[in-house]
Amino acid sequence: MKSRIPTLLFVLAISFSTTGFSQDDDATSKSNLQTYTPSKLLNRGQWDINWFHNLSTEPKFADGNGKSISKARENYFTSTVEAFTGISDNNRFNIGVIVEMRSNTNNDRKALSVFEFDGDKNTARSGITSFAPTIKFQPFKNIGNFSIQTAFHIPLVKNETENGVYLDQTAWTLQNRFFYDYSFENKDWQLFAELNTEYNFGDDTSFANNTFVFSPGIFLSYFPNSDFTILGLAQHSQRFGDFTQDYTALGFGAKYQISNILNLETIYTNFVRGTDNGLGQTFNIGLRALF
């Protein structure tokens, strides 16, 4: 799939807070799942590290008319590390970095072939493909459940495709993500929304060059207890500019707080439709450390 969006969206640590939870509230009475949402920023000196794995396998392709066509299976694995720390006394500004490693295979190889790293130059490629210095901030002092994350993705890939095997885009990316969460009155059901926007530029040979991405997503979560949550999600992504494509994905997942520091997350998604985009499934698992 020639798209950065599936990985970046599902890297999201999908945990939710209570309505109107401010940056200065005492979080000790709640689990990290409930307190530290993507909208919530860190205290000074606090660290949030996410290690997330995304496997996308595509046996079909949606053409320019949205018609689903069978193809030789393609597989895309992305391992992403995100590290953030708080640097402000008012809990409104964080800095961080995002690093991505990819392993892709094609030519109808099995989905798990991405873990073989066999170096078959005609069907496989792998490597560290990008890193992104990142800032995250709370623009409105009195709205603690809304934040913005800005990342500048710097490609480390020289050629997007070699011997017919795609690895990652060579265009640079300026990305802005807007996070908002809301908790219903009974506090068992919570809603999270994200709007992801991108501008891709800097390499005329890249499929993504001079394109914009607009990608909203919504997640509904239920908490049987404070240490466990199940969720459903819906996402749409639209790319426009010199190259156009779009897709819609639906999915579900769960998250469990293993300890005061560690959270475990798993998500499944299915690309139910698209235009000029691969169709298939993603399997995601992640580990988050907060200290």
Question: In which residue ranges do the predicted regions lie?
Answer:
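Cleavable N-terminal export/targeting peptides
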Residues: M1-S31
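Transmembrane beta-barrel domains of Gram-negative outer membranes and organellar outer membranes
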Residues: Q23-N200, T211-L290
